[in-house]
Amino acid sequence: LDIDFTIISRSDSTLRGHYPTETQVIYDVLKQNHIHIDGEILCPYLDGIRRTENDIHYVLVNDVWVPVGKTEFAKDKTFSFQSSNLKEYVEEKTNKAYLASSCISLSIADLQDESLVVSKLNSVSGFRKVIVNCTCMQDLQKFVSAYEKTDKRYIFRCAASLVKELGHITDSSYLEKEDCINDGLGGLILVG
């Protein structure tokens, strides 16, 4: 392809699903085709019901923020996991192929300094994992603003809120057929 593109792995769920197999296969196929990927960004934030703070991912359950490793999602029979800390989750799910200590964390405080986030993202290589902490849409918007200024290419493993921000999609009513047909604006490929 002679066009720039972004790969976003959404799967069944950000943390459940065939992780890390899906993103690793995507990475391997791109590498075989001489397309360089620097890292993988994990951002399971979902507005109003999921948040990540100090690398711990939480799910809102009955008005209480519960570490994801203690929820029903972590006990899924096919895709179970124990870690609520996303760095440890990466280590757990990759069977230590990527250690928690090798993950780069973008804290809430980091997100307040765009140049710091750009610098951290530009330092990534070797398909290292980047954990994005977000507690609100403003955090996510700050991350996207910094990401768009980087020189690197990533595969994303994320929830729907990040897709919306990366695509600069505003809230609107459902699309009509006429809204979807426009040959000049690129496209979206869905596989499922």
Please state what every model-predicted region is.
Residues L1-I7, S11-L140:
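Cap/lid and interdomain-hinge subdomains that line or gate substrate/regulatory clefts
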Residues D139-K142, D151:
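Extended, basic/helix-rich recognition subdomains
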Residues V90, S145-A146:
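Short, aromatic/basic amphipathic alpha-helical patches
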Residues Y147-G192:
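Acidic, glycine-rich loop-and-beta core segments that form the ion-binding/anion-interacting portion
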